[in-house]
Amino acid sequence: MNVKSTNISWHRALVDREMREKLLGQNGILIWFTGLSGSGKSTIASELEMRLYNMGRLTYLLDGDNVRHGLNSNLGFTKEDRIENIRRTAEVCKLFVDSGIITISTFISPFKDDRDKVRKLLGKDFVEVYVDCPLEVCESRDPKGIYKKARNGEIKDFTGVDSPYEVPDNPEIVVSTNLDTVQQCVNKILDFLSCKVQE
């Protein structure tokens, strides 16, 4: 990461990550959902968060749309803005993970290079969940009506229509929302996480 300011230094806190995780009784981790719009990322992530909450786990869900209302409100959907959207979000996720929180993020994050940068930043704390769903199924769901707008030319650079989605090469978890129920998808994720979040 290129830091423009040259007169700053990193200050170490007296309370470190290990102490925070011990206090919470859990390990901080980032569960990064990626997939087309309408694939079911937010639905599965919300159910996952509720299940973890009911298990007594401290979580935080960063939804791609919600983050664009605040932190990333000055970004559009050009390739450059999408890259910056993911970069900023990854840095926030890193802070949450360092605080011992099970962090769940739901971003289309269509570019492999961007996701690889998040993986590099988080290291062993990064779990990529690819929400696999055929484009035609996502379009038929179209909960926000945005595929229709994209097909009508009202939205430019829309992932899956006139901007590519690069399928992950080797995600930790793949869930198929056109084949499995939300509960089945969540169970699959929880099975994978069972040994990772336990302190």
From Swiss-Prot:
Source species taxonomy: Bacteria, Bacillati, Bacillota, Clostridia, Eubacteriales
Active-site residues, Swiss-Prot/TrEMBL: 109 (phosphoserine intermediate)
Coiled-coil blocks: none
PANTHER family: BIFUNCTIONAL 3'-PHOSPHOADENOSINE 5'-PHOSPHOSULFATE SYNTHASE, PAPS SYNTHETASE, ISOFORM D
Keyword ATP-binding: yes
Function: Catalyzes the synthesis of activated sulfate.
Family: Belongs to the APS kinase family.
Residues holding ATP: 35-42
Keyword match Phosphoprotein: yes
Pathway terms, separated by semicolons: Sulfur metabolism; hydrogen sulfide biosynthesis; sulfite from sulfate: step 2/3
Protein name: Adenylyl-sulfate kinase
Catalytic reactions on record: adenosine 5'-phosphosulfate + ATP = 3'-phosphoadenylyl sulfate + ADP + H(+)
UniProt cross-references to HAMAP family, sorted A to Z: Adenylyl_sulf_kinase
GO biological process, one term: sulfate assimilation
Designated gene of the protein: cysC
EC number: 2.7.1.25
Keywords assigned by UniProt, alphabetized: ATP-binding, Kinase, Nucleotide-binding, Phosphoprotein, Transferase
Domain of life: Bacteria
InterPro entries (UniProt xref): APS_kinase, P-loop_NTPase
